[in-house]
Amino acid sequence: MIFRRGRFSDVIGRQLDLFELDHSDVIEEAAERLAAYNRAERDEAEELYGDYVDVVETGTELLADIRDAFAGTLPEGTDELYEREFNRAVARRWKAFALEIENR
C-alpha cells in the first residue's frame, strides 16, 4: 500500500506545531481535566467531565479558527480539501479536539 502525503501536509504540520507551542496550556489542561475525571468518585464525575468538555471546546475553537483563517485565503474547492486534511491531522495528533472540529 502506498501512502501519499496530502497537498497541505507541510503547512498543516507547521500550523499544528505553532498551536502546540502557543496553546500548550490548553492541551495540558485538557489532559489534566480528563485525568481528574477518570480518578473522580461518582458524585464528582459529572462536574469534572463538564470542566473537561469546556477545555476541549476551547481547543477545538482555537484550531477551527486557525483552519478557517487559512482556508479563507484559498480558492474555492481547494479550501475544502485543506479543511479535510487539517481535520484529519488534528484527529491524528489530538483526538479529543477532533471530535467536534468538523462542526465548527
Language model region names:
Residues L16-L21, L34, L48, L62-L63, ...:
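Generic detector of leucine side chains in alpha-helical contexts
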Residues H23-R67:
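Amphipathic alpha-helical interaction modules
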Residues G6, D10, D43-E46, G50, ...:
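Generic alpha-helical secondary structure signal
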Residues M1, L63, R88-A89:
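General helical secondary-structure elements
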Residues A71-R104:
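Amphipathic alpha-helical binding modules
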Residues M1-N38:
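Short terminal alpha-helical segments
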